Amino acid sequence: MKSIWLASACILAMPGIAAAQSTLPSATSPAAAPPAGASTQAAPAAVAPDNGPNNDIVITATRRSESLSNVPIAVSAVSAQALQNSGANDIRALNQLAPSLLLSSTGNEANASARIRGIGTVGDNPGLESSVALFIDGVYRSRTGAGLDELGQLERVEVLRGPQGTLFGRNASAGLINIITAKPSFEIGGNADATYGNYNYIRLAGGVTGPIIADKLAARIDATYVKRDGFYRDITGTDGEDNNRNRYFVRGQLLFTPTPDVTLRLIGDYSHRSEKCCAAVYISTRETSDPTANPTTPGFNTDHAVVTNPSNRIVDILTSLGNVFPTPGDPYSRQVAVTPGRTYRNTTTDWGGSGQLDWNLGAVKLTSITAYREYKAGGAADTDYTNVDISYRADNGNSYRRFKTFTQEVRLNGTLFNDRLDYLVGGFYSKEKLQLAGNDKFGTQYGAFASCRLVATIFGPSAALRNPAAPGCLSPVGRATLLGAFGPAGPSLAAGFDRLSTINDVGDNLALYNQDSENY
C-alpha cells in the first residue's frame, strides 16, 4: 500500500483589491475601471450569469461567493451562454474561450492532459495526477480525462491561472478548472437541443427542472446522447472507420431547503463511451534531420528538421514487410492502415454521487461536500499505427485503468472584528484505489522489424544488406559484411540478430498493478 499524507489549514485575510485578474464587464452596464495591476477583457458573451446585488460577476473560485473584481487571483469566468455559443460540450472546447488553457489527449481519450500558461502534467501514466486540478460541482476529479465526458447543462466554468495550492491542495500548482453545473430550480423549466452535422453527427441534449415540494424540494435531470461516424477509413484491415463517437450521459439532482439557512444538494451522474479511438495518419514519410541542432550528434532528429534524404530507412523496412502508406505526405486524406485482426477501441464508464450541505450558522457558514466516484477506461489498439504487426493491445478486456475515489471536505467561512477579517478554515480527506491492467504484446512481425532496424542503423539505408525473410534480416551480402566488419565479434553479433528476429507474438496476457492512497 502506498500512503500519502497531506495536512493543510489556512486562515486568510482578504486584500482590498485584486493584484491580477481577468475582468469581464457586465452585459447591461458599462464596465468599471479596473483596479491597478488588473487587465480587462471586453467579452460580454462570457459574462457569468450569477451576478451580485451591484450587478457584479460572482464566482466561487476562492471557496466562497465573491465578486470577480475583488478576487486576488487571475481567473476567467465563462458563462453557459458563451459555452453554448461556442458549441462546447466538454472541457476540451474551453481552449477557444480561455486562451491560456490547453487541453489535449493522445493515444486514447483517457490520457487527457491540461496545461495553463504552458505548464501542466503531460503523460499517459495513470498514476500521474494533473497539476491543473479539475473540480466539478466542488468534487475533485483526480484525472483530467474524467472531464472529457459530456457535462450537461452548465451554469459557468471558472479557469484559475497560476498556483492554487492554498485553497485547493497539492494538485493545483499550475492552475484550476472549476465547473459548476446548472442547479435544480423551484420554477418549472427545461431545455432541449438537437444537432446534426457531417459524418452523420447527431447530438441530442435536454433537461427538465421543477419543484417537488414548493419552496422545499426541487429536482433536475439532464441527459445527452452523441453519435458520429469515424473520419478515418481503414484501407487494409477489418477496422472499418476509426475515431468515431458513441456516448451518452445522464445526471439527476435534488435540492432540499428545509429552512432558509440550510441547503442540501444531492447529485448523481452516469456516463458511458464506446468508441474506436485513436488511429493516426502520417504527416510525412521522408527522413529528416538537422545536423546543426546538435553538433555532438550529427543527424539527430529535431523539431526543426530539414529533409536530408528523400528516402526513409524505417519506411523502407516497413514497406518491405508489407506496409501500406495511404497517400504519403497527405495527412488530410484520412486514410489509415491497420493490421488485419487488430482494432482501436475505447470503452469508458464514469459514475458517482455527491452531497453538498450549506448551513448558515449566523456568523459562520458551514459547507460539507461528500462524494464517491468510480471511473474505468479501457480498450484495444494497434499501437504501431501500421498494418505491419509490430505491437498491439489485444481486444480481450485486459487493458484498462480503474479508479475508485472517496472524498470528504468540510469548510467554515466567516468574519471577525466587524468584518475586518474574512477567514476560511477547512479539512479535506480522500481515499483512492487505482488499478491498472495491461496486455501490451509484440506482434507476429516484431522480430523481423527490430532486426532490420538494427541492420539499417549499423549499415545505413542500403537495402542490399537487408532481407526481412532471412534470419537476422541479413542478406548474404549483409551477413558477410557484418562478419567482416566486426572481426571475432561478428559471429556473436550475427547470432544475436538471428535470435532477435524470432521474438514474435510475446508479451503480457494480463499485467495487474494496484495502488491505494490516503490523503488528508
What are these regions, as identified by a protein language model?
Residues 14, 64-66, 110, 121, ...:
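Structural signature of outer-membrane beta-barrel domains
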Residues 195-197, 232-234, 239-243, 279-285, ...:
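Extracellular/periplasm-exposed beta-strand and loop segments of Gram-negative cell-envelope proteins
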Residues 144, 246-251, 255-261, 267-269, ...:
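Outer-membrane beta-barrel transmembrane strands
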Residues 112, 129-131, 143, 152-161, ...:
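Outer-membrane beta-barrel translocator/receptor signature
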Residues 1-86, 93-96, 260-261, 353:
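N-terminal Sec signal peptide and the immediately downstream disordered periplasmic leader
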Residues 264, 268-324, 433-492:
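A surface-exposed, glycine/aromatic-enriched loop/edge motif typical of exported proteins
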Residues 178, 185-187, 195, 209-308, ...:
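Periplasmic-side early beta-strands and strand-to-turn transitions of outer-membrane beta-barrels
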Residues 53-187:
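Acidic, small-polar-rich N-terminal luminal/periplasmic segments of exported/outer-membrane proteins
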